[in-house]
A protein has these predicted regions:
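Bacterial N-terminal signal peptides that target proteins for export
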Residues: 1-10
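Glycine-rich beta-strand-turn "strand-cap" elements at beta-sheet edges
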Residues: 6, 22-37, 74-81, 111-136
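Short, well-ordered beta-strand segments in beta-rich or mixed alpha/beta enzyme
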Residues: 37-44, 72-102, 127
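Short amphipathic alpha-helical segments
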Residues: 49-72, 106
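An amphipathic, aromatic/His-enriched active-site/gating alpha helix that lines ligand/cofactor pockets
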Residues: 67-71, 90-125
Length: 136
């Protein structure tokens, strides 16, 4: 008498768990909180100094890529005003970024050299990941 009930209960539980797992993997949303630090660095240059600024940033990023805790950097250019340059950086250690990274010789040199091709100090903001959304 209990066999049909147990079989039905097991079937029901497996169906619910399968449905929940499927919904989570196909929702287009991934609760992806982690300890990574996301940094947005906004630079302003002039039209005349644009190529020099991009070249110097390229050289800097080649050195930064060798650092521990580096994940990636994306350089974005404003299509409406190419004198606006944005670095979208990802690091797996906030302490490293705010500490040792800021003291590296290549970054210190860039900060001095940038005075000749960057208009003022950059706007820097720090972010943490909450979710990732992707196409279904």
């Amino acid at each position: 008498m209990l066999k049909p009930f147990i079989s039905t209960a097991i079937f029901f539980v497996l169906t619910v768990f399968t449905s929940v797992a499927f919904a989570q993997t196909n929702s287009g949303t991934n609760n992806a909180e982690n300890d990574d630090l996301y940094v947005l660095v906004k630079y302003k240059t002039t039209e005349q100094k644009f190529d020099e600024a991009v070249s110097a940033l390229d050289a800097l990023i080649l050195e930064v890529k060798k650092e521990p805790h580096f994940v990636n950097i994306k350089m974005l250019i404003d299509p409406a005003d190419r004198t606006n340059i944005l670095l979208y950086e990802q690091w797996n250690s906030e302490a490293y970024y705010k500490g040792d990274h800021m003291g590296t010789p290549h970054l210190q040199k860039f900060m001095i050299d940038a005075r000749s091709f960057i208009a003022g100090p950059p706007d820097i903001s720090f972010w943490k990941l909450k979710n990732i959304y992707s196409a279904d």
